[in-house]
């Protein structure tokens, strides 16, 4: 019973690996050039090669060298590239150059995120201003709020004779 499981596992492994062992062309990248250009190299023995970018044919390259020049790396040659021979089998290679480390790619979801964040921040700022402005501040005193300290609008209160009251404690002779 134990040998039957191992045999079934071996047959399954051979069957599944059959597709990966088939000869599939590879695409390599050469971007260490002095002029800054990016060159794709198709590793195959076919003489006729068709180059594809994002499933669209971009042309036939140099069949002697099996290469395709993408141009300068500063022009951002991004995409999924394939080289196909006569049997139309190829591995795809995704190329993505990001020249700016601090740049933001403006796709629709990024723009929507910026707009949503802006609306939320303006709303929160408006709510904050509303609550701060709505608070009661220091009230202005009214005439009815004043306490009468001296009767009949007296400006000064006369001191009693020979009594200095509180001023006598400040100065000592």
Curated annotation (Swiss-Prot):
- Which residue positions does Phosphoserine occur at? 141, 144
- Which residues bear sugar attachments? 45, 88
Disulfide linkages recorded for this protein, renumbered to the chain, are 42-83
Query: Which InterPro entries did the record assign?
Result: CD3_esu/gsu/dsu (IPR015484), Ig-like_dom_sf (IPR036179), Ig-like_fold (IPR013783), Ig_4 (IPR032052), Ig_sub2 (IPR003598), Phos_immunorcpt_sig_ITAM (IPR003110)
GO MF terms here are: transmembrane signaling receptor activity
Give one Pfam family.
ITAM
Present the record's domain note.
Answer: A di-leucine motif and a tyrosine-based motif are individually sufficient to induce both endocytosis and delivery to lysosomes.
Tell me what this protein is called: T-cell surface glycoprotein CD3 gamma chain
Give the species this sequence originates from.
Bos taurus
């Amino acid at each position: 019973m134990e040998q039957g499981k191992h045999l079934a596992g071996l047959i399954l492994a051979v069957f599944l690996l059959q597709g990966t062992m088939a000869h599939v062309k590879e695409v390599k990248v050469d971007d260490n050039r002095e002029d800054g250009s990016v060159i794709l190299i198709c590793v195959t023995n076919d003489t006729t090669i068709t180059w594809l970018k994002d499933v669209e044919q971009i042309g036939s390259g140099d069949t002697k060298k099996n290469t395709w020049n993408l141009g300068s790396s500063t022009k951002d040659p991004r995409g999924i590239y394939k080289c196909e021979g006569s049997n139309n089998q190829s591995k795809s290679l995704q190329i993505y150059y990001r020249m700016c480390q601090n740049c933001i790619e403006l796709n629709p979801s990024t723009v929507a995120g910026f707009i949503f964040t802006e609306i939320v921040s303006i709303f929160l700022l408006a709510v904050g201003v509303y609550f701060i402005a709505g608070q009661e501040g220091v009230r202005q005193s009214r005439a009815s709020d004043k306490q009468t300290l001296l009767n009949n609008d007296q400006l000064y209160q006369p001191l009693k004779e020979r009594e200095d009251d509180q001023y006598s404690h400040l100065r000592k002779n």
